[in-house]
Every structure is written in C-alpha cells, then in structure tokens.
C-alpha cells in the first residue's frame, strides 16, 4: 500500500513522525481523511480536536490537538498544533478533574474535552 510521510508537531515538541497510510483530522471545514496522493490542502484545526494516524505498520496513533494547521501535499502531511498530547500520555482522571474545576475557563474546558475524546478514539 502507498505511504506518506507524516509529522505531528506541537509548539513545544514533535510528538510523532513517520510513514502512514491514513490521517484523519477535525478542521474548521469538517473532518478530513488524507491518504497518499491526496490533493494539496491547508486546513485549520479545530480547538479541542482529535487527529488519528494509521501508520505504515497498521498501528493507530491518536492525539488530542488544540488549534493549529494541517498541511497536505501528495507525499506529506504536516500537523502543526498549538498544543497536542498523544492519547497514550493523557491522564483521563486529571482531564475530568479539570472539567469539574474549570468554572468559566472555556479554553481549559475545551482542552480537557479534547483529551478525553482522544483517549476514547484511541
């Protein structure tokens, strides 16, 4: 099966880089699925969204992303997020505690909800 190079990068670090056969992400225009050979596109990621990557080995990588951009060419996908966490690194109980204690902090609530969704989709 055809492959493409994918990079998942947050402002503070690179979360994942490698070969993949499918990337799905939530953009402001809706959910997009990208396979090798996809037409070039630049999309804005939603706040508190989820990105899922199917690696060339068939492994599924899921991350909670908060804002940023998705850049697609025929052979590469670059995800540049304002912040991001791999689902395997997310503490769901801590995210639920943030939801319970956030009050009016809409950004904290959105980030916590995105983290919980990423774990559920992993």
UniProtKB/Swiss-Prot annotation:
Keywords: ATP synthesis, Cell membrane, CF(1), Hydrogen ion transport, Ion transport, Membrane, Transport. GO terms for molecular function: ATP binding; proton-transporting ATP synthase activity, rotational mechanism. InterPro entries: ATP_synth_F1_dsu/esu, ATP_synth_F1_dsu/esu_N, ATPsynth_dsu/esu_N. One of its GO terms (cellular component) is plasma membrane. It is a peripheral membrane protein. It is found in: Cell membrane. It comes from the Bacteria. The keyword Transmembrane helix does not apply. Gene3D superfamilies: F0F1 ATP synthase delta/epsilon subunit, N-terminal (2.60.15.10). Belongs to the ATPase epsilon chain family. F-type ATPases have 2 components, CF(1) - the catalytic core - and CF(0) - the membrane proton channel. CF(1) has five subunits: alpha(3), beta(3), gamma(1), delta(1), epsilon(1). CF(0) has three main subunits: a, b and c. Produces ATP from ADP in the presence of a proton gradient across the membrane. HAMAP family: ATP_synth_epsil_bac. This is ATP synthase epsilon chain. It comes from Rhodococcus jostii (strain RHA1). The gene is atpC.
